[in-house]
Structure formats: C-alpha cells, structure tokens
Amino acid sequence: MYNAHSRGRLSCALITGFIATGSAFSMSGQAIAAGPFDPDAAGMTGDWGGTRSELLQKGYDFTLDYVGELGYNARGGYDQDRTARWSGQFTLGAKLDLEKIFGWHDATFKLAITEREGRNITNDRISDLRAPMYSSTQEVWGRGQTWRLTQMWISQSYLDQKLNVKFGRFGEGEDFNSFPCDFQNLALCGSQMGNWAGSGIWFNWPISQWAGRVKYELAPQVFVQVGAYEHNPSLLEDNNGFKLNLSGGEGLILPIELLWTPTVNSLPGEYRVGAYYSTADAADVESREVPGDVSSDLVSRDSKYGYWLVAQQQVTTHDGDPARGLSLFANVTVQDRETSQVGHFIQAGLTYKGLFDARPQDDLGLGVARVSTNSRYRDNQKALNQANNQTDYDNPAYQPVQGNEYDAELYYGVHATKWLIIRPNVQYVRHPGGVSEVDNAWVAGVKIQSSF
C-alpha cells in the first residue's frame, strides 16, 4: 500500500537524484561553476557545472524546494503529554520564459507539484478536537498529506506590460490577499482569507483549481485585478490531487483587489484592499429550516462574501543600508455573518532584516493575531447544548462554546546559506480554538526552508 513511509522513501530518492545530478554536472563542468553545498549558490546542488546558469539564460528555471517544521508542546494545551511532531513539504517546480524559448512576448509558464507529509502537534496535543484550534502551530501541515498539482498556469503581459492576463491552475492566495510566509504559525503566514473564509471556499496553497486573473496598472505603483476561480470542494480530497475535470463544481469565487506599491522615504511598501463573492450555496451558521428546532437542517444561502486589508511597509534602514531595517505589517479580514464561523480576523507585527552587522542576511519576526468567532455561530453552539441538556465541559457530548483565539510568535531566521534558512521560534496560543476551558499553550518550533 502507498502510505506515508512510501512517500518518505520517494522524497529521499528525489533528493538523492537531484544531488547526484548536480554533482555529475559539477565534475564535468567549468571550474568556476558553484559546486554542491557552495553557500553562495542558488541551490544546495550548486550550478551543475554551469548547466543551471545556462538553462536559466535560455529561459528554463527548474527548482526543488523543501519546507520542514518541528512543533513541541512545551506547556499547556488540551493534552499536556509532552511530545514533538514534524511536518514537511517538497515542491518540484519549473518556470519557463516563453519569450526566450518560443518568442512569445512577455509570456511565462509555471508548473509546481507538491508533496506533504508528517503530523501536526496542534491536532495531537493543543486542540480540543470537538472545537479545533483555528490557527496551526505548523502551517505547512494541512490540505491532505499527499501529492498535488499546485500550479500549472501561463501568463502574458500586454500594452507595454500595463495589462497582465493569467490562466490555468492556481489558488486565490497566489495573487489576491497575498502575504509572505516566514512565520510558522498559520495565523501569521500567507493569505489569511483562505484560513477564515471556510475550508471549502478559498483555496490556499497547495490546492489549485481552474482560474483566470486579469491585472491592470491604473497608474505608476497602482494596480487593480479581478479573478474568477472554480469552486469545487472535491479538490480537497486526497485522491483528487491531479484532478483536471470540472465534476463536483458548485460555482465561482470572484475576487477583486486594489494594489498599491509605494516607496515611502525610498523604502518599499505594499497595500491591498479587496473583496470576494462566492456564487456557491453555503449553509447559514444559525438559522434553521424549522426555527428553534436544532434537529432541523440549517438554512441554505445562495452566496457568500468577505473583505480584506493587507499592509506592509519598511520604515527604517540599518546604517543607511535599504536592504536592512525594520518593516511593519497588518492584516484584517471580515466575513459575512450569515455563513461564516469566523466573523473577523486581525493580525499585526514586525520584521527586522540584518539586525546584527555580523549577520546582515538574518531576520527577526514578531507577530500577534486574534481570530474571532462569529456570535451567530456561537449562539448556535449554545442552542445545541441547551437542546441536549449539556452543561458540563468534560462531558464528551458537550459542544465547547468558541470565542476569541489569540496567537503570537517570535522567530529568529538564520540565513545559513543562500539556499538554507533555519528559523527557531516560540509560539503562544491563548484559548486554542477560542475555547477558554483549554489551557493556554506554549509551543517551541523550528522552521527549515531549503532549495536544492
């Protein structure tokens, strides 16, 4: 049977093959080409005897990346039996410059295949599984521990690069509500809309669906973009990682976003404000077909929507070096009250690049987030407990009533080489899952990012 152990053996074989290939190219190539494990090379396997650089010049960029995350429940949580969990993801990618290869003006093709494996300390120790933790202390875990087609798209620019059109297989968070993923806590990593819109609505990495996106430059540093994405919950299933047909589709996700990329005092910033509308049916979180009867079905709504704001701005340099310094960030998402478990989400924090002169590439990050349960969803939980005569939290039949969850993380990123970053971190979770009965948790973690 093909299982996690089989995937692990296949992953090791992929790494071994790439390293062996890189070594062979290095031995046969020019002496000046970066060899395997060269700290200044783009990847661990080096420049393949100059072949990697030659391919890049011709428009071919092949990559193999790995992200691994360790989580240890140091204190608190639902289950206080101490242990550690490891989750990881391999990404095999290709980016082709179609202008260099075929002469297609300003055209790019991107392909990415991912494989996830491992376990999550959040599920195993921190959460009360009757009301799981909203965030995750190991963001790389999730969406199925399996192989997936994550990107397969083509984009092309027109009108002196003012207009860009993109079509193929990709997720909403790749272009809309986008945000970096340097933190290990999910509430501080990546597009947040996908975390709180609902598990079957907005698909973040590594899920892809058929989609199209049009982006236009309204003025220097000001862009507007719109998109249309297939809404197909069956794509979440583990055995549908490479599904290309439209069976199981339920509607469309239609996002729109205004993007501003100013320079303030010659320092870069990025600001996004946007909204999405879903044409798919969604269940109301409180209203019943038979009012007051919790055994009846929830009312079905014919749409769903939400809004977001993302802000990032570098505010200082370090000794006059603009590549180093302090940056601030914030994220806000708001969901419709009729169909959303999470009503709104707020996040803020800072990063500092090159804090120490001896380590100019290292980075430090501190972030906090609050996930707020929709009051209508909470009222439904209370009604269920009342109807079932449940008042004791320790009774397995009791439905924990969810409020606000708070997540915080402090990390230090050691840029050991150009292709290896190690980020030890400490995370604090107050009221995991918004459940006040669950002890506040401390998690020690390590995030590793490597390019081969």
Regions found by a protein language model. Give the residues of each.
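Outer membrane beta-barrel transmembrane domains
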Residues: 242, 257-259, 275-305, 316-319, ...
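Short loop/turn motifs that connect adjacent beta-strands in outer-membrane beta-barrel proteins
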Residues: 46-62, 97-109, 159-162, 221, ...
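Outer-membrane beta-barrel "beta-signal"
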Residues: 440-452
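Transmembrane beta-barrel strands of outer-membrane/channel proteins
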Residues: 62-70, 109-115, 165-169, 226-230, ...
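Surface-exposed coil loops of outer-membrane beta-barrel proteins
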Residues: 122-153, 160-254, 385-397
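Residue-level signature of outer-membrane beta-barrel architecture
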Residues: 53, 68, 96-100, 155-158, ...
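Surface-exposed loop and membrane-interface regions of Gram-negative outer-membrane beta-barrel proteins
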Residues: 72-88, 102-151, 246-248, 434
